[in-house]
C-alpha cells in the first residue's frame, strides 16, 4: 500500500490533488488541516487535525495507520502569501504566521516523518509545492519569499543527507501561476503593497492562469504515479 499525506487539501491545487489521489488504486491519502469538509471526512484515509499556525501542537504520526505501508509521500502544499506589503509596514502577527505555515510547521513535520520512516524502513518521498518566490526576490512578498526559500533549503539539506540513497527523495515543484484563491488575494491588494499588481491582474484578465485540476494531474503523473 502506498500512503500519501497532503496539506492544504481544502481548496485550490490541494483540493484538486486530493480528489485525484482519493480515486487512485492501492493508494491511501491522509489530509492535514484545521477543519475538513464532509467530502474530505468521507474520502480521506485519515484526517489529521492540525492548525499549521500552531507548530507546537503538531500531532504524532500513528504507527497503526501505516502498518502496511510500502512507501510514504508527503505533499507539502499548504502555504500563505500574506502579509503582502513593504517591509516596515508588515504585521508582526502575520509575519509569524507566514513563518509557521510556510516553514516551521512543515520543517518539524518532515523531521518527524524522516525519523518515522527510517525506523520502519519505509521509503519516503517529499513533494514540495514551491514557487519562484523561493529563488528570487519579489517586492511586496518578503515573508513569502523568505519562508519558501527557508523550507526549500531545509529540504535541500535533507536531499544532501540522503545523497546516493533510495530511502528518501525530495522533489521541488513550481506549479506556475494558477487560478486559485491565493491569486485572488494577490489581485486584491493595492499597487504600493505589490508593485507587480497590474501584471498579475493581466494574467487573470487575459486567461493566463492555469487550472488547478490540470496542474494536479501533471504533478501526479510526473512525481507520484
Cite the ranges covered by each PLM segment.
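N-terminal Rossmann NAD(P)H-binding glycine-rich loop of SDR-like oxidoreductase domains
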Residues: 10-19
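C-terminal helical subdomain
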Residues: 168, 172-175, 180, 188-225
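Active-site loop-to-helix junction immediately N-terminal to the catalytic Tyr of the SDR YXXXK motif
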Residues: 137-145, 157
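Conserved mid-core segment of classical short-chain dehydrogenase/reductases
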Residues: 79-96, 115, 140
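Active-site helix of classical SDR
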Residues: 110, 147
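Rossmann-fold cofactor-recognition segment
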Residues: 42-56
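Residue(s) in the substrate-gating loop at a strand-loop-helix junction
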Residues: 131
Amino acid at each position: 500500500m502506498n500512503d500519501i499525506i497532503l496539506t492544504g487539501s481544502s481548496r485550490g491545487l490541494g483540493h484538486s490533488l486530493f480528489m485525484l489521489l482519493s480515486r487512485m488504486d492501492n493508494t491511501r491519502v491522509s489530509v492535514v488541516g484545521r477543519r475538513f469538509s464532509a467530502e474530505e471526512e468521507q474520502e480521506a484515509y485519515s484526517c489529521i487535525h492540525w492548525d499549521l499556525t500552531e507548530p507546537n501542537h503538531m500531532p504524532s504520526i500513528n504507527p497503526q495507520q501505516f502498518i502496511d505501508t510500502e512507501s510514504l509521500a508527503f505533499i507539502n502544499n499548504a502555504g500563505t502569501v500574506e502579509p503582502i506589503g513593504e517591509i516596515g509596514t508588515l504585521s508582526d502577527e502575520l509575519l509569524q504566521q507566514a513563518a509557521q505555515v510556510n516553514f516551521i510547521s512543515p520543517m518539524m513535520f518532515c523531521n518527524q516523518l524522516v525519523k518515522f520512516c527510517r525506523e520502519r524502513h519505509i521509503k519516503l518521498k517529499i513533494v514540495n509545492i514551491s514557487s519562484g518566490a523561493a529563488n528570487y526576490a519579489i517586492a511586496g512578498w518578503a515573508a513569502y519569499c523568505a519562508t519558501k526559500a527557508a523550507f526549500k533549503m531545509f529540504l535541500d539539506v535533507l536531499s544532501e543527507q540522503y545523497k546516493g540513497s533510495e530511502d528518501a527523495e525530495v522533489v521541488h515543484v513550481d506549479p506556475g501561476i494558477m487560478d486559485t484563491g491565493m491569486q485572488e488575494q494577490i489581485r486584491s491588494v493595492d499597487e504600493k503593497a505589490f508593485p507587480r499588481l497590474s501584471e498579475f491582474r493581466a494574467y487573470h484578465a487575459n486567461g493566463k492562469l492555469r487550472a488547478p485540476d490540470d496542474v494536479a494531474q501533471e504533478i501526479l503523473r510526473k512525481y507520484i504515479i
